[in-house]
Amino acid sequence: MHVKAETVLALLTPAPPSVVGQHVVDLSGDGWTLSSTALNRTVPGHLPSQVHLDLFEAGVIDIMASMILTFVGLRMPIGRIPATRLKAYFESTWLVFDGLDTFATITFCDQHVGSTDNQFRQHHFDVSQILKECKQDPVLRINFGSAPNIANTIAKSPDAEEWPPGVQITNEYPNRWYIRKEQSDFGWDWGPAFAPVGPWKPSYIVQNSHAELYVLNTDIDIYRQGQINYLPPDQSQPWIVNASIDFLGPVPCKPSMSIEIKDAATGSVLSSGLLQNVTVSGKSITGTTTIDGDAPKLWWPSGMGKQNLYNVTITVQNDMKKSLAKVTKRTGFRTIFLNQRNITDDQLAQGIAPGANWHFEINGYEFYAKGSNIIPPDAFWPRVTQARMARLFDAVTAGNQNMLRVWASGAYLHDFIYDLADEKGILLWSEFQFSDALYPVNDAFLENVAAEVVYNVRRVNHHPSLALWAGGNEIESLMLPMARRADPTGYSKYIGEYEKLYISLILPLVYENTRSITYSPSSTTEGYLYVNLSAPVPMAERYSNTTPGSYYGDTDYYNYDTSVSFDYNHYPVGRFANEFGFHSMPSLQTWQQAVDPEDLQFNSSVVVLRNHHYTAGGLFTDNFKNSSKGMGEMTMGVEAYYPIPSKSDSVANFSAWCHATQLFQADLYKSQIQFYRRGSGMPERQLGSLYWQLEDIWQAPTWAGIEYDGRWKVLHYVARDIYQPIIVSPFWNYTTGRLEVYVTSDLWEPAQGTVNLTWVDLSGKSIANNAGTPETVSFTVGALNTTNIYTTNISELSLPDLKDSILILSLSGEGRLPNASSKKAFVHQNHFTPVFPKDLSLKDPKLEVSYSPESRKFTVQATGGVSLYTWLDYPAGAVGYFEANAFVLLPGVPKEVSFVAQEGNVTDDWLQRVTVQSLWDQKVRD
């Protein structure tokens, strides 16, 4: 079952032989056709695109009907071609494909050109001779095969590798691990299984004269002299700029390379001249230069300084000084290092527990990584635009995040996404596309992976936002233990295969193409014992070779037992938290984008089936059993801690339940983030919190903090608040009654200030004698540290009614942001209640909201009582965020809040439809 498309490429009249140069035809745009023998349909096509998108635009399928889309992914390959013009007088003609998803067969002038089997590689084919022999107007055809069908065929082959039953994780389509395609296309617990195919990235026809070079890829590596990937760089050393280009065309005779480095903001020249040590290896030309260590302005992550960027132009010349190729890339000067070295004696003397470090250092400075995990922002990458990603990354920096982990088994991010991260100061922990499976290690598979690794490492290496390369997701922490339990006697085999792929193959390829980036074989590890680059397995992982009382590596934590959600004794103690979370429902407005009105019920079949936690484990369209488990977990979380919605209007009740699941999710993440950040001053010296997950791929219950269209859930607001540089946090052991209050800072210098501790009842009246609690406590908190400012036991406080009490914690301090010239004021507010929200004697806060055109701000005030989880909500028609939300509001203390519009039309009518509610409204019947 194939789809064919074709368009004529008309040849021009040949030009004189003296014509030289280069002709590049961008095949992007309309003019393609998509045809299917399976559906007996031919429709207009586009490039870049994928089959589902063109069929949807032609009205053949409903893109919201996930079961139909799954069928399309299984049954429909695709072919395309745009109309354009070629020139007959060039000596060489190449087809260049930046991304074909995944199994494609290419023909040109009815001649077979080649085939592809890797979504993540760039492919190029020489069609010079085919074009010269073409007797008619040339036609380009690309036929795509069904990835699930081909994966199944590979799995059935006699020489296919096999693993113990129950080890490989199938979400919907099976056998994803046999092929090099986006693994989440086969289904995941936060997204659909559409398995799209098509030319998902741009494609070109390149025609060269006898001398010209076409640049396929560019690797610019900037590092300190003597820097080695797994060791801390010496910040006193000069900078080395290593420039390497991969090209099409004849190998030039005695080539030279020149460089010009300009400040991207001012245009001033930092350095120019010839590169040294120019070498040619295969189809790559490489040269280096040295820059004085203090000459460039450094690039810093968000919150730590400016994002200084430079444009680097590389020119290749032949021995006659004729320019053969020129390429410009924007980059920055910084060092980023993942420190996994053993704890030193000096660190032990500071009170840091023994073991090994696991934290990042930027330009020689330890910092606290605050952020989340980013998944594919759409099931179809051609729909992911620069404007859309700019809005998402604006939300990241507005949320006080400085790092995103680019989760493995989506896709390697486009260059424009790294460009945005460079501009906004967002570090991108990047991973190779392997996740939650064991993978083959046969020669053909490894050869395919090697090309994928080299291409992508070189492609993105110039971006200062690139923070790390990790081998894959949860391979060492989840998959190897699963294999050990399933087949204890064969465990050494699986360890050997893991090391063959992620250490013996990928690690040297990374190190050969960059000296500026650290590599970790897996997202979650205990770190390494030693590195010996001359050994067959160059990195010896620690695995379970740990010592009690010592800490190693990063942590990955999910616990769906809601009875212990807020018991921080259950949270993992480690050096870095790279995954943790709990799912919640999206808002009513988001559900309305994808679900018919009659299905807007918490347990409607449509809503339940869009919940893929837990996944079907196969191609089952009625996964009620597993989906209901995930729905039940959200329900139990709400019922255990929050007022249970019971509204007479079914849609209002559905909306209230959606909001309640978000409250639980946000409070759980807040509890964990506070705990992990406090660890910066504890023996574990914990220096990172990346929660799961940043954003949604569609409208469904997931772990996301930002919904599919960009609307913030409660989580993103709460994370924004608790990711501020200096915070005050309560820690309550509800079993013993012990209450501790900590101030935590991620500044690089000590900070000072005061915390006001104020007990009031839920009508807003002060509790007598402040319940025996000091009203003000002064603090000094060290750099990247935490300090306990108050400890008590609830039983020792003079609280007339625990259910009618709330402690307001208000911090006011002063400190200096990293690389800032002067100190600034910091404020933070938190709260604590000695019972869970469902047990509080809530009062109607009688909330009011108004908008002032003059100040362009909303004013929210409570006149009847304390408003908990004060929630401003906006109608459809625009996307943006409030500068504060989900806050505590005391009666008589109005709060002004701005709205930042990111997309859409904010009209007067729209402004008047902004609403406000609180926890009180969750329990009130309308």
From Swiss-Prot:
Catalysed conversion reaction: Hydrolysis of terminal, non-reducing beta-D-mannose residues in beta-D-mannosides
Subcellular localization(s) per the UniProt record: Secreted
A matching Pfam family: Ig_mannosidase
Signal peptide: 1-21
Subcellular location, principal: secreted
GO biological process: one example: polysaccharide catabolic process
GO MF, one example: beta-mannosidase activity
Record flagged with keyword Secreted: yes
Keywords carried by this UniProt record: Carbohydrate metabolism, Glycoprotein, Glycosidase, Hydrolase, Polysaccharide degradation, Secreted, Signal
Metabolic or biological pathway: Glycan metabolism; N-glycan degradation
Active site: 474 (proton donor)
Glycosylation site residues: 40, 242, 277, 311, 342, 532, 603, 626, 653, 733, 756, 785, 793, 819, 905
GO CC annotation: extracellular region
InterPro entries: Beta-gal/glucu_dom_sf (IPR036156), Beta-mannosidase-like_N2 (IPR054593), Beta-mannosidase_GH2 (IPR050887), Beta-mannosidase_Ig (IPR041625), Galactose-bd-like_sf (IPR008979), Glyco_hydro_2_Ig-like (IPR006102), Glycoside_hydrolase_SF (IPR017853), Ig-like_fold (IPR013783)
EC number: 3.2.1.25
Purpose: Exoglycosidase that cleaves the single beta-linked mannose residue from the non-reducing end of beta-mannosidic oligosaccharides of various complexity and length. Involved in the degradation of polymeric mannan and galactomannan.
Subunit and interaction comment: Homodimer.
Similarity remark: Belongs to the glycosyl hydrolase 2 family. Beta-mannosidase A subfamily.
Protein name as annotated: Beta-mannosidase A
Origin organism lineage: Eukaryota, Fungi, Dikarya, Ascomycota, Pezizomycotina
